[in-house]
């Protein structure tokens, strides 16, 4: 069922509550990466250009005590948003009470207000974690502040919080609309099509440290993918399952039997490294050498090798849909980043395919290479995109009204 989108609604003169994902890195009041703020601009601009009043809610980090509040205020985000929009943005240093209500009452059409970090509601109260625990009273309160609710925070779509599910539920109970913003719509379109209706050949590339993080994705995508290319630390659990020597490589001993089952279920769809870049210790300065799919006892695999890169590229060149989540090696160390970077370059060269990247390290690789503009879609949600690829229902999407 298609979801109600912000552009389906008349926002003129309306107070539009928008759950955005402004969970950006901030140190000493300086924003390290404003991509998530930039990603929310299309929805915010639609509201203000069509005469609506944009009231923005977001979490920032994990608030465990009062001491966290200073470092986790959204004030620097509101200031950066003002620069990006080239217009004043009002920051309210609270998200509940008279100060909030007065700020909203004073809004004119086209104004933007940013309320303080929603997770400040997770401390200093009798309920416990009011935001993260989805306190219905908090959801009802926030819903009372607006005429329309828009969820545009894909990064928290796999969570049931007061600021997404709570508000949407209260809105719909009062006959008010809960819509998706443009960013959420884009995530649903790209990830949804990849999972439910991919153009073949469909290649999934999975990396990262743990098989356990990706079990659901592998199980869901085995019947849908033509190939599943596996690199990173998780590859060594699969290689161990095949009886290969993995030396001191990272692996999950308790997941070897599961890896065997997945290999049997997938047949020849799962493609594992045929060679590896190995070193004697986990260090960028360690001496390294290319070894086959058996790793010497005194070494650990830290990247896929050149033959594997060539094999993966050969499979990718014919792909029409590609989903990539997780690095091919210890990408944070330049000497073991080549596999990840080469996979990124291969995706950038696919001009006639839908390419989707999810996960922090894969996204970082795309940015490092400068290939982001050549990728069809870079997902803004790590855990949320994995959950979606697993075929799970995401509460933050399910709570949005159907058309």
From Swiss-Prot:
Location of this chain's protein in the cell: Cytoplasm
GO molecular function: ADP binding; ATP binding; phosphoglycerate kinase activity
The name this protein goes by in its record: Phosphoglycerate kinase
List of residues binding ATP: 214, 301, 332, 359-362
Protein family: Belongs to the phosphoglycerate kinase family.
GO cellular component: cytosol
Top enzyme class: transferase
Repeat listed as a keyword: no
InterPro entries for the chain: Phosphoglycerate_kinase, Phosphoglycerate_kinase_CS, Phosphoglycerate_kinase_N, Phosphoglycerate_kinase_sf
Gene3D superfamilies for the chain: Phosphoglycerate kinase, N-terminal domain (3.40.50.1260)
Subunit structure and binding partners: Monomer.
Superkingdom of origin: Bacteria
Catalytic activity, reaction form: (2R)-3-phosphoglycerate + ATP = (2R)-3-phospho-glyceroyl phosphate + ADP
Pathway: Carbohydrate degradation; glycolysis; pyruvate from D-glyceraldehyde 3-phosphate: step 2/5
Keyword ATP-binding annotated: yes
EC number from the UniProt entry: 2.7.2.3
BP GO terms, sorted: gluconeogenesis; glycolytic process
Binding positions (substrate): 21-23, 36, 59-62, 119, 159
Keywords carried by this UniProt record: ATP-binding, Cytoplasm, Glycolysis, Kinase, Nucleotide-binding, Transferase
Entries under Pfam families matching the protein: PGK (PF00162)
Primary site of residence: cytoplasm
